[in-house]
Each structure stands twice: as C-alpha cells, then as structure tokens.
C-alpha cells in the first residue's frame, strides 16, 4: 500500500478540516495517509512514497530550516508536492517580479532589498508593506504616506527583503479572489471579503468567504499565470483583485495554500486524481 505523508506544523499537528476530506478518497484508491509535523526531527520522511505539504503554516518563521528541509527531497525516491524547485522559488515573493517581466499584470510593487526613498512614494495615499518571506499577513502593515517619515520607513525595512505596494481600497469593496488549480487545471474559486474597517482577508481577522464563479476569460488568465510560474504543480492558488475589469495578481500560492475544499464538490477527487497521476510519472 503506497504511503503518503501530509506535512503539518506543531500548532496543528493533525489534518485540517479541509484535508480530512481527502483521506477517504485516498483510502478508496489504496493509499495510506498520515499527518507528520514538518520540523519533527524524529520523522523518517523517506519511508513515504510521497510527501504533500499541506499546513506548514509557520515555515516563514523558520525559513532557513524550512528551505533545508525542502532541499532534502531533491533527487530522492520520495516525491515532494509541490516539487522542491517549485517550493523553493515560491517562498520568496520577489517571484512576482519575474512574473511581471513575463507580462503578468501584478499589483504595482516596489521590491525593496535596499533603501527606498520616501519621495518615490509621492502621490500614493496609503501603502502596504509586507515581508518577502511571510504568510497570513504576518508583519504586514498599512501606512498613510503623509504620516510616514524616512526614518519610520527605514526602520520598517532595515532587515531582509520587503514588498511595498499602494493600498487598493477595492479589496475592501470587492474582496480578494482566489482561483484554485489542481493538476494544472482549474477547479474552483472563492471571494474573500475583509471585515469592515480591516484589509486582511484571513478568517482569523474576521474575513468572510463565499463561492465565486469567474468567467472563462479570468480562468484562462489565471491558468496562464500558473503555467508561467511553474510546471507540473499538484496545486496552485492564484490570488488577486479585479479592478476595472483587469485582474491584478497579488500572489500565487504553491507551498501550503488553503484550497477551500468546502466550497467545491469535485475538488477533493480532482486533488486525489492529480496526485495519483503525478506519482505514476
């Protein structure tokens, strides 16, 4: 019986409610599933046929350790999903710059690995500053530029790489769109709406989610983004905003995204079928 480990983290060592929906389908297809904490040194990862990253939601707090763990799966019989190459590239949000250069419409962004002058931000009322390695709005802040001094800006981005973006009020009005792809094919979408007075779209900050049906044009645009970002992805989630009928990419999640299976009837089966397909290749 083939064995698959779902990589989790210490604060949620068992499977998430979403991932539990996958287990009976995997079992029906002859697979054994077990949750394993990604940084548990006692785990023998290579006894598994495959490891699927699902809820390693503290990886950005231990980024060097996480990158080292991912690299262990290079050139091994144990398949990692997504692949080490895909994951290593996706951990640092400067991948957006590469996608921008390939013609993808990305939210206007300053990619800061060095000093940014306050004068460069003139004409923008509010900005969002976020770390290039992060998740779940970790250390993401909104600033009014008229109240922002060079000293405050320098202090905020003094270490590491950061993204600076104009704050787009449309996220409060229209919500953020998430389009999920499984095995490279479109599966389903949701709209995430922040609570009144907030901009963050995570449920822990009071956001609400609902099913969303994108048109074919948007699906094709998102699929093109996935194809430009990486090949042979088991899962990918394209997050962005629609502004004046243009889709602007915020990020593409290919490490440990919530795939929102509760908003789709076919998603869990599609996920399992894509896994089986990739494991055979």
What residues fall within each predicted segment?
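Active-site nucleotide/adenylate-binding loops and adjacent lid/helix of ATP-dependent enzymes
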Residues: 2-8, 70-77, 83-174, 216-219
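Conserved N-proximal alpha/beta basic substrate-recognition cap immediately N-terminal to
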Residues: 10-108
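Short, solvent-exposed loop/turn segments at secondary-structure junctions
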Residues: 11, 57-58, 134, 169-170, ...
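A short, glycine/Asx- and small/polar-enriched loop/turn
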Residues: 44-49, 120-124, 243-248
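A short beta-strand motif that forms the metal-chelation/ATP-contact edge
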Residues: 48-53, 130, 178-181, 246-258
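Phosphate-binding site of ATP-dependent enzymes
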Residues: 144-226, 230, 241, 248
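ATP-dependent carboxylate activation and anion-phosphoryl transfer catalytic cores
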Residues: 216-281
